[in-house]
Amino acid sequence: KRVEKKDRIGAAERAAVEAAAGGPMAVDAYGRTRITSLYLDTPERSMIARSVEKPLYKEKLRLRAYGDAAGVALVGAFGAGPIVREPGGLPLSDGGVETRVASGLQVPGAAAALPVFFGIKKKFKGIVYKRRLALTLPAALAFVSGLPYEQACARWPLSDAALAAAALSPATRQIAREVEAAMDRWLPLVPSVGIACDRVAWAYRPEMLEEREDDELFDSELRITFDDCLEYLDCHRCRSPWRPIIESSESVMEIKSAGPYPPWLVEVLSAERIYPASFTKYGNAYQLAEAEPRARNH
């Protein structure tokens, strides 16, 4: 539960924010990371069409992978032919799952056991709530296609024993029920858009957290992320290429907070005239994808 604000900014604005953050914060241990997300939606993209109208409540279903190999595997597996979750439909067979996973791997077996994250992102009155599951790519394919969550995890477990056990804990099963209910609210469900970016995330330095440990007004969970090389893939188009969402010199800055911004952040945002703006990666990719046929016909 937190407030997330995204802004599309230029190189100079990004440099100013990073310079201001460089005292109390630092780039996290992951450094620059390739992130690939795949959004599920109805064939008409009803979920995102409703979302861009800015209702009080909206939700998105998203699969996510971290790293180049896992991202390629995710998009390749879900894009290797039609996959539809529909009322009364049968889940993919074991052979169907294995074939799809193999088609998405650059190196056979390289990413099959790496976790992908599948969840629901809800937004109500500006507050974001996220519920997500960690599971293998084969298990994610099977679960999305209709296999019960527990069966999918048991058939294709995570390689880490502790993570595999956590995936079947009562708390995680409850999250799975919520994700499953969200999927079933939007049937039929298909892969809609893939989105990839390079991310750098900033978080407070450990010494800053220790120093402000007793400060009730200090938001220790504050994070600032910068996404660049942002591009999308239209899953509705066979062999569609990746296309840019923003200019190469731009970044999407996201500030994730559970409380008020610290003075240094307010100061740099004001100095650079960076004001809250409505920007969603899936929303912008959707609008670009929908405009593409019309552009080609003129």
Identify the residue ranges that each predicted region occupies.
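Phosphate-end processing signature that detects enzymes handling 5′-triphosphorylated RNA
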Residues: K1-H298
